[in-house]
Curated annotation (Swiss-Prot), chains A, B:
PANTHER family per UniProt: BIFUNCTIONAL GLUTAMATE_PROLINE--TRNA LIGASE, PROLYL-TRNA SYNTHETASE
A GO term for molecular function: ATP binding
InterPro entries, A to Z: aa-tRNA-synt_IIb, aa-tRNA-synth_II, aa-tRNA-synth_II/BPL/LPL, Anticodon-bd, Anticodon-bd_dom_sf, Pro-tRNA-ligase_IIa, Pro-tRNA-ligase_IIa_arc-type, Pro-tRNA_ligase_II_C
A GO BP entry: prolyl-tRNA aminoacylation
EC number: 6.1.1.15
Protein name as catalogued: Proline--tRNA ligase
Superkingdom: Bacteria
Organism placement in taxonomy: Bacteria, Pseudomonadati, Chlorobiota, Chlorobiia, Chlorobiales
UniProt xrefs under Pfam families: HGTP_anticodon, ProRS-C_1, tRNA-synt_2b
Keywords from the UniProt entry: Aminoacyl-tRNA synthetase, ATP-binding, Cytoplasm, Ligase, Nucleotide-binding, Protein biosynthesis
Subunit structure: Homodimer.
Function summary: Catalyzes the attachment of proline to tRNA(Pro) in a two-step reaction: proline is first activated by ATP to form Pro-AMP and then transferred to the acceptor end of tRNA(Pro).
Length: 481, 481
């Protein structure tokens, strides 16, 4: 079973690493900075992929696959892009036993290689929009790594779209950041703030970057997804022009957007506890474990457990029985709490006599008596739905309790150690940089949602927390992963 | 629409490339030897992945993800393995702006990186079997490339399993090659011969390689999947020992097995024709296109087409309407034949008056009148099932017609230019090599299936086609992709 997991209170960072490794979600590999995503962790990624892929297709996107390698000259075509990415690339210099004439970068992101194809595919407005997504691995050389959150190689999806007008591309940017918000909140049960990044935090090569930001249990922020308005930057870099409806030539308008296996780290940090993983039911491959208490008429108990599992599965609830006799029920309880199975059901001979079983929810650890009758699947389904909804509400409450509106810099400095801080900013990169230097807090997001803006009075004018200069709006500061 | 596709008769190789590019399945990229899998091609891969992934899970496997990079010293640990793979690897020498202390190979296959993890995960027989699959990209430097069939980077799945006994690992090897055979025949409608490879054709590092071999329309063979019995080779290379039930230490027994995007090339070469792609319905994302003939009461025709599509979709048949007025019905017929939509339905005002529509099957181009009544979905479903079955039978007949049993070397030399040749072989690598040098034909497979062996009298003793020495069995020779 599990090695002991450090408590969150004792050492939050160590708790995270202990949990990831004990629950067999991921492990460091023998390759510097690269992780192995173990089957338990990969199963979560598969559930995420399935939900996201469906949402991408419902919004008109198709999947494709572009090369892993990018010629050095391609990366260099977009000035900000190469400045942002070149220093963190892995570089292939030899292939097939020979030194290459041109170095190949292992993709850190695929704008350049994709736009070199789009240039060939797009001639006229009739070829637009082009709405393509790719599921792939990418590599960014990292000095300090942390499983799922920051590794040299990670898995992600990257959408790359091409449009005839800036209005359409901006619509796409917003559509996709909203898809991410819906996914984060409805599947991951993780509330997120949707909004814009400041210029200094945006993607290298973008005109504008939108993001969703979540709060972890230590009060830090985690950027959970981004959607970029690339303007005509990459079309110009790759000379990708099209004939408009009006018959003139124009450069194509572009977006890109992505989420990665980082989301698994976010999921863990948002919900899990000192016993192990807490998984929202919608992302659990196995939602219910049934543990038979093998006393008295063992065969009858086991048969009951199996028939319960069969009934749940017939009703679309993935359930399984752990009937191993080498481990005690107590050991199993701990093991499945560690693994984050959303609902545990125990059933013994006395329960069967009474026509009941005991179900425990992983998030609250609350036990409920369920009736062993034809409504079993309905009862369990109700527990799972309630758990999904309650996890979101709990995380939302936590975020609200750990968000402070602050007006003086001294309070600001202590407040950013605890959670999100809403404060006035004078809009300059200098102030942003100085605050970062002094506190390590950054501007996470300029929220776009009116209910959030109103709740925190973000549109009331005031003075900058740092410079004292006039400020037209408040922004969200936090320390971040 | 499509550029003209060269006919198979005129130039089979050019036909293939023309088809792949005209149907927008894939394209060469600006990176040497690497392809772009375009949305139409990737959709086929997604259908293949879904079916295979389900079959892997039904046989007890789970997915995981291991690093892209393999330290040079790992590849070197298994002697045959490094000899086979090192010359065709892409090598990363720089990362994060600095030269690396140890070179990293971009994985050509993952046995070594995976066994370096398995060593940590396996201590006792209780940890076995370990049944893991990975969906990933791999890189093998290729001098002469061909879209899907041979490219520097390709996508695949690689299963890597660990077992306590050689019997169990051999069972796994056979289970998975049979899964591949089932997939090839039931989904791809492509008959395959299942059997063993000779020593010279087996995987670098395997004790034994099993394969499925298919015949393309030019009579050449294509290896469509392999399953390797790795013995204890990788366990020994990585010092991966476990405590047996009996309490002694032993090395773990291993298998690996894989199929790749090469299957898309096989699918095209097995079934397609001079008009374009012919897709078996089970691998078609869009199974039915409805083309309204927009004459007379256009709105009524369009409404009928839409209601037909809705009815088909409700019954699980993915159908869509092409109602664009800028292209003629004739243009659309050609376009969807090129794209390989299995069934095309045309419906016009006169059809509606008569209560019928005209459906055409892509494989035979045969037209059938369907009744526009409540049984429409049943009628279409019947067409799709018949098409799936007929495509398999046609390919099987083709293989049988192009397989010859040959007893003299002169006939052999001309026969291998046409198709598969069943002939006696003395069992030596020397003979195998000389035949390859003289004819470019190789021993594709030592069939394992008794019906195939009996049909071609493979177990009757005789004399080697080349050396005249005694031979205990016949084998299958062919030129191959």
């Amino acid at each position: 079973m599990a090695d002991k997991i450090t408590s969150r209170e004792a050492d939050y960072s160590q708790w995270y690493i202990d949990l990831v490794r004990s629950a067999k979600l991921a492990d460091y590999s023998d390759v510097r900075g690269c992780m192995v995503i173990r089957p338990n962790g990969y199963a979560v990624w598969e559930k995420m992929q399935a939900a996201l892929d469906r949402m991408f297709k419902e919004t008109g996107h198709v999947n494709a696959y572009f090369p892993l390698f990018i010629p050095e000259s391609f990366i260099a075509k977009e000035a900000e892009h190469i400045e942002g990415f070149a220093p963190e690339c892995a570089v292939v210099t030899h292939g097939g036993g020979e030194e290459l004439a041109e170095k190949l970068y292992v993709r850190p992101t695929s704008e350049t290689i994709i736009w070199s194809s789009y240039k060939k595919w797009i001639q006229s407005y009739r070829d637009l929009p082009l709405l393509i997504n790719q599921w792939a691995n990418v590599v960014r050389w990292e000095m300090r790594t942390r499983l799922f959150l920051r590794t040299t190689e990670f898995l992600w999806q990257e959408g790359h779209t091409a449009h005839a007008t800036p209005e359409e591309s901006q619509e796409e940017v917003m559509r996709m950041i909203r898809v991410y918000k819906t996914f984060a909140e409805e599947y991951m049960a993780m509330p997120v703030i949707m909004g814009r990044k400041t210029d200094s935090e945006k993607f290298a090569g973008a005109d504008e970057t939108y993001c969703i930001e979540a709060m972890m249990q230590d009060g830090k922020a985690l950027q959970a997804g981004t959607s970029h308005n690339l303007g005509q930057n990459f079309a110009k870099a790759f000379d990708c022009q099209f004939q408009t409806k009006e018959g003139v030539l124009d450069y194509v308008w572009a977006t890109s957007w992505g989420v990665s296996t980082r989301l698994i780290g976010a999921l863990i940090m948002a919900h899990s506890d000192d016993r192990g993983l807490v998984l929202p039911p919608k992302l659990a491959t196995r939602q219910v474990v049934i543990i038979p208490i093998l006393r008295g008429d063992k065969a009858a108990v086991l048969a009951k457990a199996e028939s319960m599992a069969a009934e749940l599965k017939e009703n679309g609830i993935p359930a399984f029985v752990d009937d191993s006799e080498q481990n005690s029920p107590g050991w199993k309880f701990a093991e499945y709490e560690l693994q984050g199975i959303p609902v545990r059901i125990e059933v013994g001979p006395r329960d069967i006599d009474k026509g009941v079983c005991i179900a425990a929810r992983r998030d609250t650890l609350e036990k409920t008596e369920l009736q062993l009758d034809a409504t079993l699947a309905v009862q369990v389904s109700g527990m799972l739905s309630a758990m999904q909804a309650d996890m979101f509400q709990k995380a939302l409450r936590f975020r609200e309790e750990n968000t402070r509106e602050v007006t003086d810099y001294e309070t600001f400095k202590s407040a950013v150690e605890e959670g999100f801080v809403i404060a006035h900013w004078d809009g300059t990169a200098e102030t942003e940089e100085k605050i970062k230097e002094e506190t390590r807090a950054t501007i996470r997001v300029l929220p776009e949602e009116s209910d959030y803006r109103e709740h925190y009075h973000m549109d009331e004018p005031g003075v900058c927390i740092f410079s004292g200069k006039p400020s037209s709006q408040k922004v969200v500061f936090a320390k971040a992963y």
